[in-house]
Amino acid sequence: MEPQATEIVTPLSTCSAPRGRVRWILIFWMFVISAIAYLDRVNIAIAGHSIAQEFGLDNIRLGWVFSAFVFGYALFQAPGGRLADRFGPRKILTIGTIWWAVFTSLTALVSAGVAHALLTLIAVRFALGVGEAVVYPSSNRLVAAWIPTQERGLANGLIFSGVGAGAGMAPPLITFILVQYGWRWAFWISALMGLVVGALWYLLARDKPEEHSWVKPAELAHIKAGLPQSQVQKPLAWGTIFGSKNVLAISLSYFCYGYVAYIFFAWFFIYLSNVRGLDLKSSSYYGMLPFIAMAICSPLGGWVSDVLGKRFGKRIARCGIAAASILLSAVFLAMGPVAHDARIASIVLAGGAGALYLSQSAFWSVTSDIAGRSAGSVSGVMNMGNQMGGVVTASLTPFLAKHFGWGVPFYVAAAISVVGALAWLAVDPSKNLTNED
């Protein structure tokens, strides 16, 4: 049984924290974990050219390596969410960070000279995906317990701005390490960062606000008053989750979202260097732009959602913002490939990434709103759809580019974005999930 926070003596538990802000300290630390997780995820895209040369891989086989991570990540979303619901985000996220640090290190240890080197690399990346699968279902379980409904847009936006921050700092940081020390060191340093944030998370976090010694009565009352009164107390059955129109519609939209997002995570750096002809240094700087846009637009979209929610309700605040943002992303994606200048194309496509991330918090806020204590499980199912979109784009993008040119993958992504926006028309964020549904 998890001990009460007052019984745990650590250096952190004896410190003072700003009164009434403990929930935001945990959200900030989820931002940090999110950033490191995405740094660990996209470092292989930056080092992809060096790895491909050493292992003798073309873009198709390199796409298999990219897909292996996403496939493992996708398959374990729902189980990871259920684990977070059952054992709490504190323990599960700590185990996850240790797991992914180990397999990030093993990526660097794979040698091109061993038998079945490609299969070994694929297996290691698959296992890394399994470890990272617990991150966002765990964060959503934390949000469901710690964050009042009216603050969830901003909270989720801040957490997912870590995606842009981590992926944005990856190009210059990984490029510097790669040039100075070789690609393997990029993975060892990334692994060390994961271990550090995981250890600090275990010391700092608690699963519930009433378990944390820093939480004052006023903050606890504020949190409890803002939680949905009809939150589900018993775990939702899998049949209830998979049979929900809300969950299916959100998962479809998040599949489309993931398809688009993974073009930036897996292929954008390679697109700038190999297709647009930018040198390594320029590619690293312009490759940051989509992720900077993500880091800015994710909390911005969440904040706008919270503001609109107070005046117009959740349907406009969540569904309207998400649909409009994803449609705007489609416009930028269609315009980017026709820009003749590589730098202009980078800026336009970065606008598409930013517009996409204006919708990010809506997905996670709706799932925490409708699922209560099963928020980890429901968001895990939703995020499985997102990652399956990533599986498709990791392999389909180089295929389309090879046979039809590099403009086509972006046009296909724009069309898929339209489908993702339309799916939000079927979502009712005011309808809570129950096992009687």
Protein language model features and the residues they cover:
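Extracytoplasmic gate region of multi-pass secondary transporters
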Residues: 44-45, 244-299, 360, 364, ...
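Central cavity-lining transmembrane alpha-helices of secondary-active solute carriers
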Residues: 67-82, 288-301
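C-terminal ends and interior cores of transmembrane alpha-helices
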Residues: 98-115, 327-340
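Hydrophobic core of transmembrane alpha-helices in multi-pass small-molecule transporters
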Residues: 103, 117-134, 332, 343-358
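Cytoplasmic helix-loop-helix junction between adjacent transmembrane helices
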Residues: 124-164
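Helix-loop-helix hairpin linking two adjacent transmembrane segments in secondary transporters
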Residues: 163-212
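C-terminal transmembrane helical hairpin of 12-TM major facilitator-type secondary transporters
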Residues: 315-362
